[in-house]
Amino acid sequence: LRERGAVEISTVANEKVEDGSFSLPGYDIVVWFVGDESSANIVFSPAEKAAITSYLNGGGKLLVSGSEIAYNLGRTGAAAIDLPFFNNYLKATYVNDGSSSYTPATGQAGSPFEGLTLPFGVVYPEDFPDAIAPTGGATTVLNYAVLPNQGGIAYTGTFGSGILPGAVIYLGFPLETAAAQGMSL
């Protein structure tokens, strides 16, 4: 970002994406914070999933973080429509519902996050981070303190019917719970 000079940042409530009044295409990157949210076992509405799917199919780049995403979309008993979105667009599989002992997350050797230590659950408590595993060409970028559990995956390539390469970084914990003073490289 520093090399790009001026950076324009916009924020919008997910409900605006859901009702169609805000469109994701045209943005270089979308950062989607889910936090601890899972209302009635719904993390992404059908309209939100459709918007994200279209954005990634068109070569979009998505950073998404949250502790209930994998639990909601990827566990046994998840809605049949959720698993293909989770596997094919977030490029992950659900491993387990973790605990607060999973912090900090550390960068996977050989990944762009190598050497990073990222304590989470600091700004607000995070008691159930999702352990996830990469699928569909994704790779692990962050590991939890309780190994072999993984907390971050990344993928670059095409999605679905798309012909333009896009990218996703998916974190199984709320990134916004990390305190800057606890991060180290």
Question: Model-derived features: where do they sit?
Answer:
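Structural alpha-beta junctions
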Residues: 2-11, 54-61, 167
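A glycine-centered loop/beta-turn motif at secondary-structure junctions
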Residues: 26, 30, 57-65, 121-185
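A glycine-rich, often tryptophan-bearing local segment used as a flexible ligand/cofactor-contacting loop or short
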Residues: 37-122, 134-138, 146
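Alpha-helical scaffolding within the catalytic cores
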Residues: 14-22, 44-51, 148-157
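Short linear motifs in intrinsically disordered/low-complexity regions
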Residues: 15, 20, 88, 97-98, ...
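Short, solvent-exposed polar/charged micro-motifs at secondary-structure junctions
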Residues: 19-24, 104-115, 148-154, 181
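Aromatic-Pro/Gly-enriched surface loop or interdomain linker
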Residues: 1-36, 161-162, 177-181
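Extended interaction regions within the primary functional domain
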Residues: 1-5, 78-83, 119, 123, ...
